[in-house]
Amino acid sequence: MKFSAIFITLVGLFLSPTSHAESLHSPWQQLLSKHVYPINQGSGTEVDYQAFKAQRNTLKNYLEALSTVSQTEFDAWPKHKQLAFLINAYNAWTVELILTEYPNIDSIKELGRFFSSPWSKKFVSLLGETRSLDNIEHTLIRGTGRYNDPRIHFAVNCASIGCPALLEEAYTADKLEQQLTAQTKRFLTDTSRNYIADDTLYLSSIFKWYKSDFEQGFKGANSLNEFIVIYADALNLNQNQQQAIKNNDMDIEFLDYNWALNAKN
């Protein structure tokens, strides 16, 4: 009996960091599964902000739980747990930011001031500091060099139609690789944001703004063109088109970004 109690305690000690990291996101998982809907044959999603607003206390409790994670605890996690945590934090606080003015808002950009954007607003209590959304994305995720994964651009969501879809579930450590791959393909499949016409490849402006992130050797890709070819199937590229892109023989143009709110009508 005593041995069993000790064994259970030891198992709990070994499992607690993982179980805490995963159970932490359960409220966010429930909110997303209820209030985010696929559109455009699944290539995008829209968000029922009115329903989110009705459950804002649940969202706030989740954000408070994220805020209790210390830098020491975070640093002890493997990087896939860290990255899932940071993506969820970014997306959840973005929804909270929208709810501060919804329904009297048509775009997240309306929440900025004349000399500052909504992404520079410091309202996020995370890892012992008050941060902005920019800080989460560009410092904690992109700036450390720890993750070096350009697919995060298809996971963090800026509450706009032009953004990659807000995933209908929380990011988790054990599913992160699968989720990032699926989100990348999902975005590239959306012909309203990425397509070929008249021997020109038209891409979302995301690829222009963060071009350098796609040149850092992810899966052997040292250029945007090489990254695109990795996901040739999602773009429905034939062999000739793939070769033209590899050889820089195809023009690439970047589409205007749609900043309208990704709200469910």
Label every PLM stretch briefly.
Residues 5-14:
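Bacterial N-terminal signal peptides
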Residues 16-18:
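N-terminal signal peptide c-region/cleavage motif recognized by signal peptidases
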Residues 22-87, 91-265:
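Interaction/scaffold regions that mediate signaling and macromolecular assembly across diverse proteins
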